[in-house]
UniProtKB/Swiss-Prot annotation:
InterPro entries with a match to the protein in the record: Aldolase_TIM (IPR013785), Alpha-hydoxy_acid_DH_FMN (IPR012133), FMN-dep_DH (IPR000262), FMN_HAD (IPR037396), FMN_hydac_DH_AS (IPR008259), LldD (IPR020920)
Active site: H275 (proton acceptor)
Cofactor(s) required, per the database record: FMN
Name of protein: L-lactate dehydrogenase
Keyword Cell membrane assigned: yes
Homology family: Belongs to the FMN-dependent alpha-hydroxy acid dehydrogenase family.
Native organism: Acinetobacter baumannii (strain ATCC 17978 / DSM 105126 / CIP 53.77 / LMG 1025 / NCDC KC755 / 5377)
Residue positions binding FMN: 106, 127, 155, 251, 306-330
PROSITE patterns: FMN_HYDROXY_ACID_DH_1, FMN_HYDROXY_ACID_DH_2
One cellular-component annotation, GO: plasma membrane
Pfam families: FMN_dh
Any GO BP: aerobic respiration
Length: 383
């Protein structure tokens, strides 16, 4: 198969993965309206073409939290990444490191902090949920700090798990789920050998380290389900802010008032995100939410954005709408599932190329030049 775009990686991943894994990463909440709008709204944003501007000296380099990034992209935290390729978190982190961008390790990764951090040269980021088990949270923070993680990404849009109906149909959950997953794996021998067998252990490494025993997929569902905390408030984050002395980013902001609260709290950054359409269906796409949030807090903290970003054009669009940097989630997991770490490297190079074309034809010589002036006026006013 010829790979020429991010969509090609999605198609390749669908062929290679057992359905329960493909649909877990590909699906969203409820009827998946927000999942679709994330992609569609971004694709409908018209860039303003400018020509004859001598674009020979063009740079994608940017700075964020005292780190230099080769382009304004980081890999987002994605749970179970190690189920999509053999020791998938390590492979993805190495690809990000090679490209000169941050990798964010999920709380519910297969590979633990202690396995991923030594595999790369630059400090990785670590993502954490607010959970009832505060002992686990403190343990994870201590281990992240000891491993040299530079930035904490705190996910706040999961006080309860989203209703992901596709998971019940695919075998990730629902009746006879374990048997259905086993039967699917039989018909995907490449994955079964390369990941299912050679990629062991399939523990949720960060949780296993804390509990002192292996945890499999069923444990993941049960332990997390009992630990989500709907009582969380900004006050619950205060001890974390005091404990963590590095940059702290609040992930899951969709409203300008919440963004202002993050500034008052003392966050270093926010991620404008609807969790990739996986939590509450019917909320605004990140692209639609971003401009008002940028108007409210631009300059007070770093603004990151995710959800719906599939290519370099989408990165430029998000930056023009007010983001400083974007996070890639599904896009890199598709590439990882299709072709391992090399697939992620190829995807990042493709995004780099797509960004350069878009910047050249919008007259933006640097990342700081990408702003609302790069958008068609009607789009700026009526997104």
């Amino acid at each position: 198969m010829i790979i020429s775009s991010g969509n090609d990686y999605r198609a390749a991943a669908q062929r290679r993965l057992p359905p329960f894994l493909f649909h877990y990463i590909d699906g969203g909440a409820y009827a998946e309206y927000t999942l679709k709008r994330n992609v569609q709204d971004l694709s409908e944003i018209a860039l303003r073409q400018r020509v004859l501007n001598d674009m020979s000296a063009l740079s994608l380099e940017t700075k964020l939290f005292n780190e230099t990034l080769s382009m304004p992209v980081a890999l987002a935290p994605v749970g179970l990444t190690g189920m999509y390729a053999r020791r998938g978190e390590v492979q993805a982190a190495m690809a990000a490191d090679k490209k000169g961008i941050p990798f964010t390790l999920s709380t519910v990764s297969v590979c633990p902090i202690e396995e991923v951090a030594p595999a790369i040269n630059r400090p990785m980021w670590f993502q954490l949920y607010v959970l009832r088990d505060r002992g686990f949270m403190r343990n994870a923070l201590e281990r992240a700090k000891a491993a040299g993680c530079s930035t904490l990404v705190f996910t706040v849009d999961m006080p309860v798990p989203g209703a992901r109906y596709r998971d019940a149909h695919s075998g990730m959950s629902g009746p006879n789920a374990a048997m259905r997953r086993y039967m699917q794996s039989v018909f995907h021998p490449h994955w079964s050998w390369n990941v299912g067998l050679m990629g062991r252990p399939h523990d949720l490494g960060n949780i296993s380290k804390y509990l002192g025993k292996p945890t499999g997929l069923e444990d993941y569902i049960g332990w997390l389900g009992s630990n989500f905390d709907p009582s969380i408030s900004w006050k619950d984050l205060e001890w974390i802010r005091e404990f963590w002395d590095g940059p702290m980013v609040i992930k899951g902001i969709l409203d300008p008032e919440d963004a202002k609260d993050a500034v008052r709290f003392g966050a270093d950054g926010i991620v404008v995100s609807n969790h990739g359409g996986r939590q509450l269906d019917g909320v605004m796409s990140s692209a639609r939410a971003l401009p008002a949030i940028a108007d409210a807090v631009k300059g007070d903290l770093a603004i990151l954005a995710d959800s719906g970003i599939r290519n370099g054009l989408d990165v430029v669009r998000m930056l023009a709408l007010g983001a400083d940097t974007v996070l890639l989630g599904r896009a890199f997991v598709y590439a990882l599932a299709a072709a391992g770490g090399q697939g992620v490297s190829n995807l990042l190079d493709l995004i780099d190329k797509e960004m350069r074309v878009a910047m050249t034809l919008t007259g933006a010589k640097s990342i700081s030049d990408i702003n609302a002036d790069c958008l068609v006026q009607a789009i700026k006013q009526g997104l």
